Amino acid sequence: MKFKTTTKVIKECVLTVSKAVDTRPSTPALQGLYIKIKENNCELTGSDLDLVIKANFEVESIVDGECLVNSRIFSEVMRKLPSGEVVFSDIGNEIKVETKKTEYRLRKLDHLTYPKTLLEQQHNTSESKQLKTTSLFEALKKVGVAASPEGGKPILTGVFFDNENNQ
C-alpha cells in the first residue's frame, strides 16, 4: 500500500473517524483505524462495535492495499504533521508517514483481525436514510435532554429513531 494526500484532508478524516474507537476495547483490533486504499480512494473505518464511523476521500493511489494502525498513536502523528503533501507507505510490519520535513514509522496491527462485519455494512440499503448533519444535531439537542446520563434505568439512556412516511 502506498498513497499520497494532503495533511489537511487526512487530519480531518482521522480526527472524525477516531472518535468511534474505544479507548479500552474488547479486542486489540478495535483500538485501530482500518485504512483501505483502492483506485484513488481512501476509506478510513473506526468502531467500538456499537458505533461505526467511515470517511472516504480521494488520494493519489500508487499501490492499493489495506492496513490497521493504532488509532491513538495515528491521530497524534496526524496532529503533528506540517501542512502540505504526505506520503503513506506500507513497509513490512510498519507504515511510514513521510512529509518534506518529517518521517514517522508506526507499527501496524493485523488487519485480518478487524471484524469484517464492520467493513461490509451497506450504506444505502432500503432501511438506511440520509439527513443533513445540522438537522440531526438540532433534533438531538431537542430530545437529548430527556435521556438519562446514568445507567440506573438502561431503557432511558438512549434516543429512539423512527422513520415515518420517509421523513
Regions of interest found by a model, annotated:
Residues 1-167:
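Structural preference for solvent-exposed beta-strand-turn elements
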